[in-house]
């Protein structure tokens, strides 16, 4: 996902975290964005305009009446050029001025003139942030359509411990990507995605599971959220970072996955069953650790609920997309799953193809639909996720 052709305007105000915005500017440039920076006069006490000019290739604006530039009405030209404005760190002073329409420097003037999406990342002492005046000002900005990125908690520059830290750079960038990187062609579509493995306990120490890492399902959830969908991510235990802009529903067992999916199914428009749900579980779970003994051990297993087998025949308006992982007869087995479970589409994965399968960042998939099959080349799981969403948009006529 990139920002080619997009202009990001960074508004840097006078907080100790101002220096962190140099890394944000650099990262945005690597994503292809055209980055402009406006600093308040106080911000120049923490980091120099030259730093941003070197990183962005543009003059860093500070003084509203600066004459050292090609003549334009600068506050209007920057306001029109920007696809998104991020004010970070946003001090209590700048937040108060923006909330009340005060435009007494270049930054607040541009913010007032701009019609693009505006993001604000407060960063200040905990007492200042939690002061009712600041909270009212943030609420006012939200009423006017600003997006407030919540501060993080931790040790602050003043040595206090509490909220008020500037969010991590990757969080700020993720908010920018979510705002402008992709057209919102899935706006209003309610999507549920399952991802990762399940774990079926044998005793208090051991469980049955599989090799799924959840990467494919998480990629689908992130891509759908970036395109404006209302996404619920139902996932088993994984080592992945949560997907922002989604409802996160962690589960452990196949039974819990079944309950989480079926309870939400009526209010779902599209369901992606990308999770590797256990087909079997131990018939009984021992209360204590099973001790090693001489000879073999036999573990009786029982079937877990068949989620797609249950909801497939009951679907009304929903689009059901299953996933299959095969080691042979990929198309035949996946086509049988499509028909048996009344699915609209199956994304079939061949575990034996190089670059596909568990734990890797690439995949090779085949789309199985009632109309036939379409094999995709090796690509990143992020690109596979977008290809899946494009296919569903086409088939649903969204």
Protein language model regions, located:
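A cross-family phosphate/adenosyl-ligand binding-site feature
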Residues: 1-119, 125-398
């Amino acid at each position: 996902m990139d920002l080619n052709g997009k202009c990001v305007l960074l508004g840097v105000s006078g907080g100790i975290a101002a220096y962190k915005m140099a890394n944000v500017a650099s990262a945005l440039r690597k994503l292809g964005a055209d980055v402009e920076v406006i600093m308040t006069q106080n911000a120049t006490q923490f980091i120099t305009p030259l730093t941003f000019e070197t990183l962005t290739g543009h003059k860093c604006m500070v003084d509203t009446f600066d004459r050292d530039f090609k003549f334009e009405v600068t506050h209007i030209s920057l306001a029109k050029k920007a696809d998104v404005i991020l004010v970070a760190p946003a001090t209590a002073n700048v937040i108060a001025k923006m909330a009340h329409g005060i435009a007494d420097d270049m930054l607040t003037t541009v913010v007032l003139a701009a019609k693009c999406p505006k993001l604000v990342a407060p960063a200040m002492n905990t007492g200042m942030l939690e002061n009712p005046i600041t909270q009212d000002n943030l609420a006012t900005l939200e009423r006017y359509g600003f997006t407030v990125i919540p501060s993080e908690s931790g040790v602050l520059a003043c040595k206090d411990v509490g909220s008020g830290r500037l969010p991590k750079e990757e969080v700020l960038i993720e908010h920018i990507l979510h705002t402008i990187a992709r057209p919102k062609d899935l706006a209003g579509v309610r999507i549920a995605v399952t991802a990762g493995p399940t774990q079926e306990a044998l005793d208090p120490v051991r469980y049955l599971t599989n090799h799924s890492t959840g990467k494919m399902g998480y990629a689908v959830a992130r891509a759908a959220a970036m395109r404006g969908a209302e996404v619920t991510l139902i996932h088993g235990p994984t080592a992945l970072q949560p997907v922002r802009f989604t409802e996160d529903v962690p589960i452990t067992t196949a039974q819990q996955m079944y309950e989480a999916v079926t309870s939400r199914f009526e209010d779902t428009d599209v369901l992606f069953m990308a999770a590797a749900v256990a087909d079997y579980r131990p018939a009984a779970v021992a209360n204590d650790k099973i001790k090693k003994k001489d000879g073999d051990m036999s573990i009786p297993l029982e079937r877990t609920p068949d989620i797609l087998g249950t909801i497939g025949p009951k679907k009304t308006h929903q689009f059901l997309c299953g996933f299959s992982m095969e080691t042979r007869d990929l198309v035949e087995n996946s086509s049988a799953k499509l028909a048996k479970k009344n699915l609209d589409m199956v994304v079939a994965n061949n575990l034996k193809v190089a670059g596909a399968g568990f734990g890797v960042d690439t995949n090779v998939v085949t789309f199985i639909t009632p109309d036939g099959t379409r094999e995709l080349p090796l690509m990143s799981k992020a690109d596979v996720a977008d290809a899946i969403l494009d296919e569903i948009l086409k088939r649903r006529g969204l």
